[in-house]
Amino acid sequence: MNRYYFIKKFDQSHIDKQDKKTIIIFRNYNQDIDEKLILTIKNYCKKKGNKFLISNNIKLAIKLNLDGAYIPSFNKDKKHLSYSVRKSFIILGSAHNVYEMRTKELQNVNAIFLSSIFKKNKNYLGINKFKSLSLLSNKPFIALG
């Protein structure tokens, strides 16, 4: 079973603490994307044996030959469906409700992060609602705190 670790910046010590089954996802919406930084993280993850995904930019993930991309819940775009990607390219998405789940299915993601299970924010689902929603799709689900 894979684990997922979201990062906002490159900090080797955080990646070093992860095992090889942990997929690293770079997600920082507060700054412009620095391709050089992305390549640095990619190369470090490769050296450590971790897969590396970037958030909300499938085109760049393909261009930089990353392991995949993560599509956040607010992204409804389906342009990437026309892109040619290798078979092992991973596309993950996140959702908070049935509408967003259906959008992620139409975006043809490999798995859906469903959040949040615990009462931390306005998108709180709880365990029972998580179970109910996860029965509505054949896609694999990943519970987010």
Give the ranges of each region predicted by the language model.
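Glycine-rich adenosine-cofactor-binding loop
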Residues: S94-A95, G126-G145
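Glycine-rich phosphate-binding active-site loops on the catalytic face of alpha/beta enzymes
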Residues: P72-L81, F113-G126, L144
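Conserved N-terminal beta1-alpha1 strand-loop-helix module at the mouth
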Residues: M1-K78, Y83-N110, N138-K139
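Broad hydrophobic/π-residue packing in well-ordered secondary structure
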Residues: L37, G68, A111, F118, ...
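Short flexible/disordered coil segments
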Residues: K87-I91, L114-K119, L133
